[in-house]
């Protein structure tokens, strides 16, 4: 079970093997945002979620806290972020203090699969670009739904396969992508209403991120030459995923509401 969790965690961060997990904080040390767009999340929350001083948001697999901190800063709402990497949690806490929202943000080191069994009654849960760490899509949606109130919201950052593509066309084979139609059917079967979707239209600078990661990769190869293949495969996976996002799959952010 632990091995499965580690493997899913590795894949969610574009790592081909669990052997890379101890090195991911080093490889990603120059990045704050690790996949999701805080701006898109804030836009969807503003449009659809009635907030009050008692509102609370759960950010699962929160990474370094970019989404949590930006939401707290922009909306003045309480956010509780969970991530499995202690280094990421520490960085998130530092960023919350830097942005003056440490009273609104709380970060905990923990496994998302355990978190969904204990956290309850949130107004919204965010699951941003975390892949299949909670299981297959149906299982993921069911687990997320348990953490929110009736009529609460799920914001999920995902990608789907265009109708004219197959999974064989995807370069980074981390899991099987569903089509948009398959996702919509799944939402309905899980008692979730699609409220809005935002296609990823940000002109995100993948090249800059990849250069930073490549530099850190070279540093690690110098320190651990016996692991050269693992590090180089990680860079290749990053490049393949970026190419997929640009050409082969459609990145999307959905806001869903739990039906009565």
Language-model segment annotations:
Residues 155-175:
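Short, glycine-/aromatic-enriched active-site segment of Class I SAM-dependent methyltransferases
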Residues 1-25:
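N-terminal, positively charged/glycine-rich alpha-helical extensions of SAM-dependent methyltransferases
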Residues 116-125:
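A short acidic, Gly/Pro-enriched loop at the edge of an enzyme's catalytic core
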Residues 124-136:
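A short SAM/SAH-binding and catalytic strip from SAM-dependent methyltransferases
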Residues 35-53:
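Conserved alpha-helix/loop element of class I SAM-dependent methyltransferases that forms part
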Residues 198-260:
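Conserved Class I S-adenosyl-L-methionine
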Residues 58, 66-114:
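Class I SAM-dependent methyltransferase SAM/SAH-binding core
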Residues 138-153:
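A short glycine-rich, Lys/Arg-flanked "PGG" loop and its adjoining helix->strand segment in the class I
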